[in-house]
Amino acid sequence: MRRKRGRPIDGWLVIDKPSGMTSTDVVNRVKRLFDARKAGHGGTLDPLATGLLPIAFGAATKTVPYIMDGTKRYEFTLRLGEARDTDDAEGAVIETSDVRPTDDAFRAALPAFRGDIMQVPPIYSAIKVAGERAYDMAREGRAPDLPPRPARVDRFDLVARPDADTAIFAVESGKGVYMRSLARDIARACGTVGHVAALRRLRVGPFSEADAILLDKIVPSDDNAPASPDLLLPVATALADIPALALTHEEADALSHGRAVSLLDLMGRIPDAVDPACGIVRGMDGARVIGLCRLEDGWLRPDRML
């Protein structure tokens, strides 16, 4: 039997991604540094962007969908006067404008971009169109016609105006919201054009900048051994934002072995914030997280167990 390559390590590492690297480049580099068998990231960042890139190792990869569904916090710099084909500073200029909106004009336009909105992704994105990546089509001169997609924006505020050509915005959003599209569209709504000149991700689900380390701080030991797993956060860290449900040892054992538990046995313990018809909880056996469980049809069912 072919032996699997790498060490079976489990946990999360939050990298402060430098500008110029793709998210895949960062994952591959970190995976080599730790000699890890299995790794993946919790949400793509554009190459231009900096900030939080959570990387899951081993069992933590089971919790990636919950990180990707979590709230993200960003700050981006809008450069006014030039539209670019990529909607960021790396693209070619396709349109210019001399209009420079006032702060009041921006603030008047912002409410239309908050809440549940429809958003057209950038043509340079990883979305597939008839089996092809949109960015591959765009690079070949076949700009894809991308339909609007649902997006949720919880916060979108103007936070600084360094000069007439530049505006800085803070955003909190759900999964799959493109900052480049927000920048493009807020400029259009104010009668001008613009693109993202800088972008930083400040938070992903339960992870904040306090959890992040720089990529160049991960170095092999003197004997060239892999980086220490002591740098990793526990697998359960990713689930900190999900309401906890206290279980008996017997209930935890049943769920861990794939068996459902009746909600009638859990009455009075289900957190108020959880929908008993379709909610997700973090199952706790004492201080130990056993995994994620779903409330469904009168039962608590195992969803992703650790």
Curated annotation (Swiss-Prot):
Any single GO BP term: tRNA pseudouridine synthesis
The keyword Isomerase is annotated on this UniProt entry: yes
GO MF terms, alphabetically ordered: RNA binding; tRNA pseudouridine(55) synthase activity
Record-linked Gene3D superfamilies: Pseudouridine synthase
Domain of life (superkingdom): Bacteria
Function: Responsible for synthesis of pseudouridine from uracil-55 in the psi GC loop of transfer RNAs.
UniProt-recorded name of the protein: tRNA pseudouridine synthase B
Upper lineage: Bacteria, Pseudomonadati, Pseudomonadota, Alphaproteobacteria, Acetobacterales
